[in-house]
């Protein structure tokens, strides 16, 4: 008999060799019906996996991230099967699950069309109805290559040949279709209830522009049609809110072919950026942080010492100066560490909180670039905290509270994830255990709900990730707290303890916005470009009906500017209705309309983006109203 520990801590005994699907049935028939995959000792596996030793088990449904992943991974295989049935000469490349669904890349001597997608979708429905079992099998390297050569699948052959010697080479079979795949998958095609093919795109093989351009079909999958319909409605809303479209319409930023992945911020975009950074600085000063600035370019040796060279080299840019090798920083931490090392520190100095709005550069493949969300140059709102082991819990709690304050200001709900040790990591088991427990205890002490993401920590330590949920239900990972015992060791950091001896500090890396650029992109979409008054690049649009009000308009403009209210004037010889419509398209919070009546009464006619026509009030009353709105940062 083997002992299986369930997620709730309950221990059950079963015969050795029992399948996970059978355990799900014994736990509850309702759970068995919803089950899609499982986690065994933190590793995601198929439900048909047999258990031969004592293990911890979590049954995954569509409510779980990896349950969704397994279902959508199977959706990609169903798409490939449908394409091969309809167009047998097409060659298969890769087809993974992604956050929003799945895709598959194909090589074809024709171009897929929207009409073809409809035909493929109809075939997908047939395959789902046929309810084929997904059966995993493994082959030795040469047999695996022969199988794919026999099927004329050149890309699969290349993938197998690139695998390390001794790597397990697995396949999944469903009906008449077999694909190279590590899994996991759901038990049968019938589990994938609702599929929708969404779009077509070009994609270079392996993301390399020197390789052949393939055709990518995107899709998504759900267990219920109602969930699919809700998602499709969200996509329509997301199109209206696309920050790339609104960024252009509202004149906030642009990206040019002379610098792909390097955003250009325009004056209005800079206003938003400066407000976010000023607020960040104010709150960090209140919370006891000291701001630093470190160079963009640092010697290559530093990146070897930090470990970034081994773990991050492919994402870095390099240059040569005075016959020396240098790298443009992809992260701020090594530079921040040099600031710490520049002085001797006593235990009385700790915790030491150093913050930096540091520009970093990371190489992203051209196909992955996406407006402000995925760029090659961005400002990371970093802070690095140095502390004793005894201070870990209190400092982590303080960071969580600061992050919470920021996200609530912008009206974001969020969820928290604790990510544990990855395979590619540095440091001892003991350090990782202390670090992980430190983060866990901080979360538990303030009653913050979280889920555990096994194996997704940074290479130098475990982390807490904060995922924002926007107003249309999408999630964005922004803030992070990473506990690090490794960097202090690598850089021989120390402080003098109460005993007069040298001790090693604990280091914490953390961000709140994550990337300032990306956070602005998220805000553009969160507000659909209609920023709250305190954040709006233009807070008031001032317009006259005829030239007769021009002198009064200039006096009103001057009064607004004296009160630090951002105002634009529209004195064009256009109909007032046209001016109003244009200001509405620019999503400006307030319009002040001046006609002869307003001049005579010394008032302003106020039109609010939110509440419509507010009538005529004194200029002093309006200034008091808007200043209060800005002060309290009303959303």
Swiss-Prot record:
NCBIfam families, A to Z: thrS (TIGR00418)
Cofactor: Zn(2+)
InterPro entries the UniProt entry points to: aa-tRNA-synt_IIb (IPR002314), aa-tRNA-synth_II (IPR006195), aa-tRNA-synth_II/BPL/LPL (IPR045864), Anticodon-bd (IPR004154), Anticodon-bd_dom_sf (IPR036621), Beta-grasp_dom_sf (IPR012675), TGS (IPR004095), TGS-like (IPR012676)
Region (Catalytic): 242-532
TGS domain boundaries: 1-61
Assigned EC number: 6.1.1.3
A single GO BP: threonyl-tRNA aminoacylation
Domain of life from the UniProt record: Bacteria
Quaternary structure, from the entry: Homodimer.
GO CC terms, sorted: cytoplasm
Lineage per the UniProt record: Bacteria, Bacillati, Bacillota, Clostridia, Eubacteriales
Catalyses which reaction(s): tRNA(Thr) + L-threonine + ATP = L-threonyl-tRNA(Thr) + AMP + diphosphate + H(+)
Protein name as annotated: Threonine--tRNA ligase
């Amino acid at each position: 008999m083997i002992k299986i520990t369930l997620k709730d801590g309950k221990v059950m005994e079963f015969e050795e060799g029992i399948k996970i699907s059978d355990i799900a049935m014994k736990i509850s028939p309702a759970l068995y019906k919803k089950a899609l995959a499982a986690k065994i000792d933190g590793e995601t596996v198929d439900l048909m996996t047999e258990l031969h030793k004592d293990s911890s088990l979590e049954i995954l449904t569509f409510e779980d991230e990896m349950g969704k992943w397994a279902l959508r991974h199977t959706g990609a295989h169903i798409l490939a099967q449908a394409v091969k049935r309809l167009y047998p000469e097409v060659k298969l490349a890769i087809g993974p699950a992604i956050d929003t669904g799945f895709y598959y890349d194909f090589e074809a001597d024709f171009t897929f069309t929207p009409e073809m997608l409809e035909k493929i979708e109809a075939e997908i429905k047939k395959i789902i109805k046929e309810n084929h079992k997904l059966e995993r099998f493994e082959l030795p390297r040469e047999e695996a290559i022969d199988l794919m050569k026999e099927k004329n699948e050149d890309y699969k052959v290349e993938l197998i040949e690139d695998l390390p010697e001794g790597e397990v080479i697995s396949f999944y079979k469903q009906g008449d279709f077999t694909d190279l795949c590590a899994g996991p998958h759901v038990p049968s095609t019938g589990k994938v209830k609702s599929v929708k093919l969404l779009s077509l795109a070009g994609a270079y093989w392996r993301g390399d522009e020197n390789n052949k351009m393939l055709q990518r079909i995107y899709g998504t999958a759900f267990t219920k049609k109602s969930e699919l319909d809700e998602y499709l409605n969200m996509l329509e809303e997301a199109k209206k809110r696309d920050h790339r479209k609104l960024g252009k319409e509202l004149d906030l930023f642009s990206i040019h072919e002379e610098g792909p992945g390097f955003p250009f911020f325009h004056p209005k975009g800079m206003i938003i950026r400066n407000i976010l950074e000023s607020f960040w600085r104010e709150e960090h000063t209140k919370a006891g942080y000291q701001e630093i600035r470190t160079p963009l370019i640092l010697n290559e040796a530093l990146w070897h010492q930090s470990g970034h060279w081994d773990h991050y080299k492919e994402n870095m840019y390099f240059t040569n100066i005075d016959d020396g090798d240098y790298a443009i920083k992809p992260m701020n931490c090594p530079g921040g560490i040099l600031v710490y090392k520049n002085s001797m520190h006593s235990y009385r100095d700790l915790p030491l909180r150093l913050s930096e709005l540091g520009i970093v550069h990371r190489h992203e493949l051209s196909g992955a670039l996406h407006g402000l969300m995925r760029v090659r140059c961005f400002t990371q709102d970093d802070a690095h905290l140095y502390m004793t082991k005894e201070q870990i819990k209190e400092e982590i709690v303080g960071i969580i509270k600061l992050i919470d304050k920021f996200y609530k200001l912008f009206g974001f709900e969020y969820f928290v994830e604790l990510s544990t040790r990855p395979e590619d990591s540095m440091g001892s088991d003991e350090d990782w255990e202390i670090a992980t427990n430190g983060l866990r205890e901080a979360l538990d002490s303030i009653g913050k709900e979280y889920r555990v993401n096994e194996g997704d920590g940074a290479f130098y330590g475990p982390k807490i990730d904060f995922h924002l949920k926007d107003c249309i239900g999408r999630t964005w990972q922004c803030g992070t707290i990473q506990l690090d015992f490794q960097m202090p060791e690598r850089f021989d950091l120390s402080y003098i303890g109460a005993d007069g001896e040298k001790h090693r500090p604990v280091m914490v890396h953390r961000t709140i916005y994550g990337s300032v650029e990306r956070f602005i992109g998220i805000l553009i979409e969160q507000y659909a470009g209609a920023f709250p008054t305190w954040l709006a690049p233009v807070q008031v649009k001032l317009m006259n009906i005829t030239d007769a009000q021009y002198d009064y308009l200039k006096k009103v403009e001057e009064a607004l500017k004296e009160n630090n209210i951002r105002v634009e004037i529209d004195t064009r010889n256009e109909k007032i209705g046209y001016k109003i419509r244009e200001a509405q398209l620019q999503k400006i919070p307030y319009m002040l309309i001046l006609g002869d009546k307003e001049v005579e009464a010394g008032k302003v006619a106020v039109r609010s983006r939110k509440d419509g026509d507010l009538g005529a009030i004194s200029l002093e009353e309006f200034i008091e109203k808007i200043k209060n709105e800005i002060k309290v940062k009303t959303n």
